[in-house]
Amino acid sequence: MSYCPNTPEDIREMLAAIGKGSVEELFEPIHHTLRAKSFNLPAGISEQELLVKMQELAACDRHLINFIGGGYYDHHIPAVVDHLSGRAEFYTAYTPYQPECSQGTLQALFEYQTAICRLTGMEVSNASLYDGGTALAEAAMMALRITGRNRVVIDASVNPFARQIVATYLKNIGVEMVEIPTSSGSADRSALTEALTGDVAAVMVQNPNFFGSIEDLTAISQAAHAKGALLVTSVYPISLGLIKSPGEMGADIVVGDGQSLGNPLAFGGPSFGFIATTKKYIRNLPGRIIGETIDKEGRRGFVLTLQAREQHIKRHKATSNICSNQSLCALRGLIFLASVGKEGMVELANLNRDKAEYAKERLGSIRGVRVLNRGATFNEFTLELPKDAADVVRTLMEKGIAAGVPLGEYYAGMANCMVVTVTEKRSRGEIEALAEALEASL
């Protein structure tokens, strides 16, 4: 919002309206010891001087070759995403409750829902959630409502930050969260089968998981359904250009983080979460839902539908508790998907996979380094090093390379391991620079 200062005439008019003679009189009730004496601000400068100052500050930034993933990824963003999402018609925090005023926004969000359903292989989607972690937690709450049960089973190879969010949601409502240990970077199937008792509402997995491994979840889906539990799958959307959709593998609820779909890395946000499910569970879906309808004159239109689930009607019993501002990030996701297209998503996913495979082979050939992933990976993989991974990451950062995510903080016994991510933006030269720096640090 532009800064609009009050003119002396504005101030006089406002003071007269409330019966005050001066600004000093207006603030009289505030004790003088609590009032700011001076803001210690420098004098104003020109636009050109301000630009120079900002450039000086920007020059202080360190630009690293980025191999960090773990949930947020350094993908290319087409210029059209910024161009269209920045239009004034979209760039607003307004919730489109009045369909007669909001057809453009409503249609864009309707198309977003369609895109998410096509991407995940599911039947219905909402208009976005906060981020991937809260989307996973909302999926757990949704499964609890649907089944009426009080246990959730979650694979330890789900992103540790997302697991913490789920635990926070569940810890004070009498629900037990059971973590299944990992085995060589994948879910321990025998431990999962043992944990699947008759009171489990959901089995929660991630594919590809935090270590980068891809799994066929069909067997896990069948085991969960045999016990009356739902399968909740967290996915990395870019990977769905290459691997089988969670809907095809029997997932009941699919969630994920949309940062990789046209949203920049900006200190961890903002982003958006997505959630999709089957039609029979639509009334348990959190968040806003956009529906298509026909008006009395026979024209196609869009509205917020199933609003009885929302806060302004159900209050504390609402399943919808998501603010409007995430819609802008979701719009960026839609523009990204539309600009890349179906064939482009396949090409993008293959490019990520191919570059990661090259990096995995190159880094795995370094003496003392071992690739932990036994099966297929997408654009992330886990390395075991002959020394503490956090120390190695710090050393390589001094050389201008952000080498990966050390795992010692999140997994016991894995202090020597780190997850490396290779997106389409990383070049062969940058991968070689990582390999040489890593070899020199060991």
UniProtKB/Swiss-Prot annotation:
Q: Which reaction does it catalyse?
A: N(6)-[(R)-lipoyl]-L-lysyl-[glycine-cleavage complex H protein] + glycine + H(+) = N(6)-[(R)-S(8)-aminomethyldihydrolipoyl]-L-lysyl-[glycine-cleavage complex H protein] + CO2
Q: Which GO terms describe its biological process?
A: glycine decarboxylation via glycine cleavage system; nucleoside metabolic process
The molecular function terms in GO held by this entry are: glycine dehydrogenase (decarboxylating) activity
Record's function text = The glycine cleavage system catalyzes the degradation of glycine. The P protein binds the alpha-amino group of glycine through its pyridoxal phosphate cofactor; CO(2) is released and the remaining methylamine moiety is then transferred to the lipoamide cofactor of the H protein.
Question: What NCBIfam families would the database entry show?
Answer: PRK00451.1 (NF001696)
Origin species: Geotalea daltonii (strain DSM 22248 / JCM 15807 / FRC-32)
Its top-level enzyme class, in one word, is oxidoreductase
Q: Which family does it belong to?
A: Belongs to the GcvP family. N-terminal subunit subfamily.
**What name has this protein been given in UniProt?**
Probable glycine dehydrogenase (decarboxylating) subunit 1
This protein's UniProt keywords: Oxidoreductase
Description of how the protein assembles with itself and partners: The glycine cleavage system is composed of four proteins: P, T, L and H. In this organism, the P 'protein' is a heterodimer of two subunits.
Keyword Oxidoreductase assigned to the entry: answer is: yes
Superkingdom as given in the UniProt entry: Bacteria
Q: What Enzyme Commission number(s) does the record list for this chain?
A: 1.4.4.2
